[in-house]
Every structure is written in structure tokens, then in C-alpha cells.
């Protein structure tokens, strides 16, 4: 039986898994739709995830450049149409994937005439340029340029001066970096219906990344960061739910209590009728339903949902569980065979 304190979180509706709506470039753009959420939770979760997505995910960026013949960033390079300041701005847009946490060196050598693109940069084996068509500069005929870059990993925004080594050679130009692989995040909260109740939120996250991380993975990592930070505030131990129970004494592979019929749960008439009308016969059928699926059952409301969740919790079970190979063959025969276990 759940306690009053347990009901603080157990009676809240749990949303379905996010639905991913891929953009024209699935590796970079997508919308994630989450519903149903308790009223107000769309804004709460959307704002928290957006802030973490933009500020806290690890990524790679160019943090410094040294150009042959250039002493400082306000110089002009003979035969190069762009000045150094413009080149530095272009370098900030180079999208990079790098697994190592050790800074790496990259080199660019080019001869004119023509555009010099990011794809011409010579990279170590564990570094990849994700937007090779990005134009870095344009060379006139007969001109050439050589640049050496430092690339590193980090999070958030770091100012250029923080990237200047103490032993930096003359001509080394530090670059401020936006490490985050997430380029843009927006969210929208709308009303949504579950069953007959129009009192829930639908959260839509609109995410664009640089391609080093997919939108859905970026949300997963952001959620993991929030989980890790919030865990520190939980000052009590939660009881472990025994989902196996008597299964250890049988060869079923699951708890034989799942073979018990739902009409034996002593539910209210309304809840029992809703389960019957939805062809939910056994507890094993019931626990595999999500809360959202249950609320879509005709005449099934929040009161019935809370009643069922409380009864299942008293048995060490909950909605949304997975039971491999369910339903088993000859389920009625198995129910009689293991009647003493249930």
C-alpha cells in the first residue's frame, strides 16, 4: 500500500515516450513531442531542458589559430580577400566532432585562386569536420595560405583570453568558443486531452544541433544531467519493488501473480467495468498498459487510475512494465497450476 508521501509522485500521470519528428536533416533537426504532462509541467520541463541543452552539453570547437605571416587578428593577408577578423568569425562556425579530451592540432594548406573550405583542413584520425562546405576564406590567383588550429572539448561559452596559453608564440590568436553541440532550442506548450480530461500539457521541443549529436540524444543527455543534479535533494530511501517475487520458485520466468485475474483485485465497480470493457483480463495484461493508454479507456478517469496504481503498488507492481512472451500459451491452465503461488 502506498503512503501519503508516496502519492506525491505516484499519483502524477507519466507521459508516453517522446515522439521524434525528424526535420529535413534528421542528424541535426528534430522536434520531440511529450504528452500527457501534468498541468504546468510542460513549461517546467521545457525551460529546464532548454537551459541545460544550451549551456551544459560537451562539444568541440577551434580555440586558437596561427596563420603564417600574421602577427595579430587585425592584420590583412596578401592575396586573401577576407581580413583575419572575418576568418576568425568563420572559424567559429566550423562544426567538429572529437571524442578525445586532449587538445588536438589541425592544419590547413591552400593555394589560390578559389574558396578555401573547412573540408580542406587536415585532421587527426579522431577528429571530424561536420560542415566541410563552410567557406573559411577566398584566395586570389597565385596566393597561398597556411593555418594551424588548436581544437579542444568543453561546455558552454568560453572567452578567447581563457584559451591563450602562457607560452603562446607570437601570432597565436585565441578564439572564444561555443562548445555546445546544440545550436538552437525552442519549446512550445499546448493543451492536450487524455480520455475525457482536457487538463494536461503537451510539450514540443524544437532542437537544432551541429550534427555531432542527434537532437534526441542531446535531450537524453540533458535529462541525465538534471537527474544527477536533482538526485542530491532526495533525502530518503525508496523501497525496492519486487517485480519477480515468487517467480524464483517457478519456471515461468515471471511472477505468477500476473496470472491472477483483475476481477480479484477488489476494485470499484467503475474501475472493474472499464477494465472488462477494454478486454483486460489478467494482471499481466494490466501492468503492460501505460497511464496514458489507461486514460484513453472510455469512462476511465483519474480517480480510477489512482485506485489501480495504489493496488498494484501494494503488490510490488506498476503500470508500464514489460513482461517478455506475454501472454503465455494455455494461460488458464497455468493460472490453475500456480494457483497456490497467487
UniProtKB/Swiss-Prot annotation:
Residues 1-237 are annotated as: Alpha N-terminal domain (alpha-NTD). Its EC number is 2.7.7.6. GO terms for molecular function: DNA binding; DNA-directed RNA polymerase activity; protein dimerization activity. One of its GO terms (biological process) is DNA-templated transcription. It comes from the Bacteria. Residues 254-342 are annotated as: Alpha C-terminal domain (alpha-CTD). Belongs to the RNA polymerase alpha chain family. This is DNA-directed RNA polymerase subunit alpha.
Amino acid at each position: 500500500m502506498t503512503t501519503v508521501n508516496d502519492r506525491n509522485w505516484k499519483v502524477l500521470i507519466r507521459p508516453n515516450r517522446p515522439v521524434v519528428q525528424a526535420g529535413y536533416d534528421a542528424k541535426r533537426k528534430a522536434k520531440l513531442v511529450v504528452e500527457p504532462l501534468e498541468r504546468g509541467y510542460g513549461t517546467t520541463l521545457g525551460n529546464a531542458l532548454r537551459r541545460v541543452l544550451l549551456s551544459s552539453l560537451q562539444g568541440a570547437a577551434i580555440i586558437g589559430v596561427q596563420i603564417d605571416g600574421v602577427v595579430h587578428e587585425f592584420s590583412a593577408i596578401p592575396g586573401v580577400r577576407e581580413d583575419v577578423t572575418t576568418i576568425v568569425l568563420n572559424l567559429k562556425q566550423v562544426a567538429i566532432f572529437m571524442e578525445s579530451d586532449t587538445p588536438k592540432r589541425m592544419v590547413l594548406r591552400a593555394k589560390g585562386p578559389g574558396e578555401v573550405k573547412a573540408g580542406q583542413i587536415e585532421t587527426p584520425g579522431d577528429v571530424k569536420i561536420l560542415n566541410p562546405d563552410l567557406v573559411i576564406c577566398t584566395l586570389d590567383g597565385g596566393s597561398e595560405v597556411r593555418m594551424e588550429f588548436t581544437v579542444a572539448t568543453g561546455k558552454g561559452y568560453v572567452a578567447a583570453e581563457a584559451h591563450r596559453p602562457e607560452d603562446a608564440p607570437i601570432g597565436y590568436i585565441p578564439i572564444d568558443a561555443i562548445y555546445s553541440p546544440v545550436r538552437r532550442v525552442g519549446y512550445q506548450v499546448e493543451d492536450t486531452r487524455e480520455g475525457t480530461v482536457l487538463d494536461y500539457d503537451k510539450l514540443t521541443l524544437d532542437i537544432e544541433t551541429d550534427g555531432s549529436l542527434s537532437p534526441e540524444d542531446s535531450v537524453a543527455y540533458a535529462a541525465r544531467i538534471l537527474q544527477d543534479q536533482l538526485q542530491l535533494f532526495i533525502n530518503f530511501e525508496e523501497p525496492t519493488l519486487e517485480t519477480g517475487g515468487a517467480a524464483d520458485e517457478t519456471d515461468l520466468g515471471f511472477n505468477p501473480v500476473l496470472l491472477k485475474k483483475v476481477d480479484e483485485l477488489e476494485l470499484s465497480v467503475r474501475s472493474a467495468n472499464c477494465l472488462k470493457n477494454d478486454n483486460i483480463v489478467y494482471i499481466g495484461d494490466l501492468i503492460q498498459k501505460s497511464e496514458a493508454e489507461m486514460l484513453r479507456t472510455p469512462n476511465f478517469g483519474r480517480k480510477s487510475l489512482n485506485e489501480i496504481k495504489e493496488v498494484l503498488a501494494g503488490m510490488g507492481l506498476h503500470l508500464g512494465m514489460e513482461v517478455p512472451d506475454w501472454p503465455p500459451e494455455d494461460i488458464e491452465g497455468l493460472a490453475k497450476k500456480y494457483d497456490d503461488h497467487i
